[in-house]
Regions:
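Alpha-helical transmembrane segments and their immediate juxtamembrane cytosolic regions
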Residues: 1-231
Length: 231
């Protein structure tokens, strides 16, 4: 059995805690309106925090096997999130603001499935492509277009809204930067800090079970905050 890289599991677990915090604030402020708090710095933090997951995923893809299979699984989990939010909206349990189009799981899945197209490129070319994707994606954030069919890339149509939106630009760029880091830092495909009894067990556990935690945490948070709001 292949030994896991414990520090990447711990980093993924720590990143999950940050995202859970972001979703808790979303539920309190935007979904139920029980807390009036929305400073500018937090908006910047929230809008860019997903890059952490893309970087970690990019590092990890250089260590694992079957990225297309794994990516398809993650994408399907993301599609499940979209289906659930759409069902909640259609059944009247939530407003349109809850809908998820191209969320972080769908983006991660697409990046993994696309990785074989970039895998043979040398690292300088990957970094050049990543820089172009990131620059284009950051520019697209301030633009709107009259066509909807390139939304997955970051070309947002007029009136578009999504509670979780991670287009390929700039996020595929962050993923490719992570892949370059993975090549550099994990050439031997093993931990850089080999320990008999690695620390941060809780974070490691979260990192190993990140997909399940991501799928379950928001319904639990929404239910708890909803009960709090009603009380």
């Amino acid at each position: 059995m292949k030994k896991r890289v414990w520090e990447l599991d711990a980093a993924r677990g720590l990143a999950l805690i940050g995202m859970i915090g972001i979703h808790l604030i979303y539920d309190l402020v935007e979904l139920y309106g029980v807390w009036n708090w929305n400073p500018h710095w937090y908006q910047v933090f929230k809008n860019n925090y997903g890059a952490v997951f893309l970087l970690i995923s990019g590092i990890s893809v250089t260590l694992g096997s079957y990225p297309v299979k794994r990516g398809f699984q993650v994408f399907c989990c993301g599609f499940l999130c979209t289906a659930v939010t759409y069902g909640m909206y259609r059944l009247g349990f939530a407003g349109k603001e809850i809908l998820i189009y191209i969320g972080v799981l769908q983006c991660l899945g697409l990046c993994m499935m696309l990785w074989p197209l970039f895998e043979k490129l040398r690292s300088p070319w990957l970094l050049a492509l990543a820089a172009g994707m990131i620059a284009l994606g950051l520019w697209l954030r301030g633009e709107a277009f009259s066509f909807p069919w390139l939304t997955v890339l970051g070309f947002v149509p007029y009136g578009f809204a999504s509670s979780d939106y991670f287009p390929l630009f700039p996020n595929l760029g962050y993923f490719l930067v992570g892949a370059v880091l993975g090549r550099k830092l994990y050439r031997e495909k093993k931990s850089r800090f080999p320990l008999e009894n690695p620390p941060l067990k809780g974070l490691q556990w979260m990192g190993r079970n990140s997909l399940l935690i991501y799928l379950l945490h928001q319904p639990v948070l929404a239910a708890v905050v909803g009960l709090f709001a009603m009380g």
